[in-house]
Amino acid sequence: MSSNATDLTTGYLSSAAAILLFGSNFVPLKKYDTGDGMFLQWVLCAAIWLVALVVNLILHCPKFWPFAMLGGCIWATGNIAVVPIIKTIGLGLGILIWGSFNTLTGWASSRFGWFGMDAEEVSKPMLNYVGAGLSVVSALTFLFIKSEIPNNPGSSDTTPLMTEPVINRTEDRSADSSWVDRLSTTYHRIVGCSLAVISGILYGSTFVPIIYIKDHSRRNDSMYAGASQYDLDYVFAHSSGIFLTSTVYFVAYCVAMKNRPKLYPEAVLPGLLSGVLWAIATCCWFIANHSLSAVISFPIITAGPGLIAALWGILIFKEIQGLRNYLLMMLAFCIILAGALCTAFSKV
């Protein structure tokens, strides 16, 4: 098998693994109350950093580039909204929307060389444009799908580790609920979709610093001259940025809550598992980026998890119901599949 064929095989297999894991990594959290998500964010990011540390040791500790941490900071900022998104519009629809905008941002920045990156060329540019255009259509389609989310998805026996002393349980129950739980049904969809769009754009920018370093490593006059071309060498710096940023946000949250944050013990192990799944998926994505290039891997890996998450939402959690929604979902699936295939074949 030729080197090019090996790269393509490795890239597409890594993409498939990343799609499956990204589409399922929030599933362990669905049955547990996670409050406003700030504590969960920190637990999840701690697990991500630990997995990245293991990978870094396996790779014999490649050079640490601090600028690569910026991508992790961007990702952690977008990830703050995950719990509110899932609580307002559901797991399936949330991942579908943020995945679509993730796709467009990542594809456009790689294809056109935004933020100082080198523009990436493909052998069939028209097919690549069609694939990206179909991602836009799928994103618009998802906005018309209505999800059904219960007001209190957490179990009734879930209680925070740290809350105000309870004198009147009836009055304090509403006080203990997060701002998301207190939103009226009217605002659920507006808030959820808006946050999903913002998160998607931030997610789509997360690899920009790494690609920037790789592109400038080929220039002798650059401070990044000689930097590694292997994407996985940057996973530890990327994850360190994630953990550092989430820690800063969590400390700020504790200060804002006057040192009485809402910590949910039942969410700790599911949060760690979710972080491990996400970290493994990200490592697969880094491998796919190296084997296929970001302009190919981004549209495939960012569009695919929505299909997996939607299946979880339809078959297991019953978030999406009704013939109209099922038909729209099937249409969106077909559009995503067509877009992913166009993108994949644009490099062949």
From Swiss-Prot:
Keyword Transmembrane helix listed: yes
GO terms for MF: carbohydrate transmembrane transporter activity
Pfam families the record matches: TMEM144
Keyword Membrane: yes
Membrane topology: Multi-pass membrane protein
SUPFAM superfamilies: Multidrug resistance efflux transporter EmrE
Cell location: Membrane
Family the UniProt entry places it in: Belongs to the TMEM144 family.
Protein name per Swiss-Prot or TrEMBL: Transmembrane protein 144
